[in-house]
């Protein structure tokens, strides 16, 4: 498979910034590069938007993924809220018929368990450019709330960062029937039933 990993924001666009100035753009880059390495170790092809703290437009991201004919588009973000107690993982997809809808459910289930954060579930939106303009099945992962002080403190721990990366990597690998990164992890893989082959998972 060829994966497109989109690390949100970058450069002049820091994305969400915590009370202690932890940047979303830096956080997802660190996590994303670990995911890239995990996938490549399993002989998966990976294309990225960026591998440094650089800015790229939303149109650049989707155009590059489409030009590369990637099989799946995975966009990584950290969430933020004025409610500083908000916490949990959620994944956005274009609609419920998406081929990656069940993958999104699995990511929520597994990441919630692996880093002990609430499962906020799969959400639907046709407004996200990276979901709307990509030709391949796409998801946008909101890993957790960088605005939550507990989450922000955890992000300083390299083991926690690695746990996030491994959890997401393993959900992706399980989706395409590849071995998981760490045998100590157990993963939920929901396949489901479909009426036609175009909406079936494979």
Where are these regions (language model features)?
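Short glycine/serine/threonine-biased micro-segments
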Residues: 6-9, 13, 73, 86, ...
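Generic anion/oxyanion-binding catalytic loop in active/binding sites
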Residues: 17, 54, 188-189
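Gly/Ser/Thr-rich beta-alpha loop segments that engage phosphate groups in nucleotides
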Residues: 10-13, 17, 81, 90, ...
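Solvent-exposed beta-strand motifs enriched in subsets of small alpha/beta binding domains
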Residues: 180-202
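Short glycine-rich His-centered loop
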Residues: 1-21
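Active-site-proximal helix/loop segments of hydrolytic enzymes
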Residues: 3, 22-182
């Amino acid at each position: 498979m060829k994966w497109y990993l989109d690390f949100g924001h970058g450069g002049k666009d820091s994305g969400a910034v915590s009370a202690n100035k932890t940047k979303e753009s830096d956080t997802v880059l660190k996590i994303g590069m670990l995911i890239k390495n995990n996938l490549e170790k399993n002989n998966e092809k990976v294309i990225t938007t960026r591998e440094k703290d650089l800015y790229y437009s939303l149109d650049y991201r989707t155009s590059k993924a489409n030009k590369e004919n990637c099989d799946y588009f995975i966009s990584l973000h950290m969430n933020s809220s004025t409610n500083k107690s908000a916490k949990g993982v959620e994944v956005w997809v274009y609609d419920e018929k998406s081929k990656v809808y069940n993958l999104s459910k699995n990511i929520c289930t597994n990441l919630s368990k692996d880093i002990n954060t609430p499962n906020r579930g799969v959400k639907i939106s046709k407004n996200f450019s990276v979901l709307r303009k990509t030709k391949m099945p796409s998801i946008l992962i909101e890993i957790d709330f960088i605005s939550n002080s507990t989450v922000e403190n955890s992000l300083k721990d390299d083991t926690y960062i690695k746990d996030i990366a491994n959890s997401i990597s393993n959900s992706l690998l399980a989706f395409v029937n590849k071995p998981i990164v760490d045998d100590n992890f157990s993963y939920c893989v929901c396949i489901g039933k479909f009426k036609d082959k175009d909406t079936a998972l494979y």
